[in-house]
């Protein structure tokens, strides 16, 4: 049987010979990590066995290069990967550590099911509950919260979740709410944000979920992001960088002159609505370019004459108010839909 694919996506990998950083399509399997030059390639450029390997995160060996983690094999070979943002790195680290642990224990990798361990009643439909929690009018309100000089965008507190469960009559009391919230967390419907909630989720507290105003959580597809809040009042950001970050990640972008496709890291901001793109391998903070989204049109594209038939999937196009065309490619249909929706929302806000 083929090893199960646990997670896949773009990461920047440090070369083992020339020490250069390059974006790769990375696939986490039950027994190893494969990396490809392009997502469409059939054969991997390399494979890292996970048996006996150790993982280090955060890895701060490279100064300003953020969100790096290191995998050291039994042969003492170090492999360095860089994610586009904090939550992406944490997801890779969490799943990779779990895969290594499963190999050690001779178990099959499975997302943690809390239904059995917490004795959750079979009548509780966590999926339906999650959709109710996300309801724009009656659900949990997403906020921008500040703690330890960091701003947590699109999140909410642990006690707000329990308040909502009780007031919505989903549970009879706060203790029962804690049990349900822990199950939602275990099944991936809620994600921890910040040290307090992450430590609890990793088993450092009595319950994985905290009924606490200082414990922050977010919905996995909400566009959550944590950013440093500079206390220096003299720093005046460029107007286009003032907007709140609502989504980020890697996409393929077509060049305007040569029409070739390259992996770029994108950061989407609203009010003012801008989509900045960066060279993920450079590790720098200066964008290669910016797309002003106010009044733009964004649509999915089913074919493009400049793209090979085998690589035509998940394309979309942004046409700015100045009629500049940008062609982008997501990794999956779901990811394309998420980007299109987020850009449409941003394009209608602010300047």
UniProtKB/Swiss-Prot annotation:
Major protein kinase C substrate of platelets. It comes from the Eukaryota. The modification Phosphoserine is found at residues 113, 117. This is Pleckstrin. Pfam families: DEP, PH. Residues 4-101, 244-348 form the PH domain. SUPFAM superfamilies: PH domain-like, Winged helix' DNA-binding domain. Residues 136-221 form the DEP domain. Keywords: Acetylation, Phosphoprotein, Repeat. Transmembrane segments: none annotated. One of its GO terms (cellular component) is plasma membrane. It comes from Canis lupus familiaris (Dog). The keyword Protease does not apply.
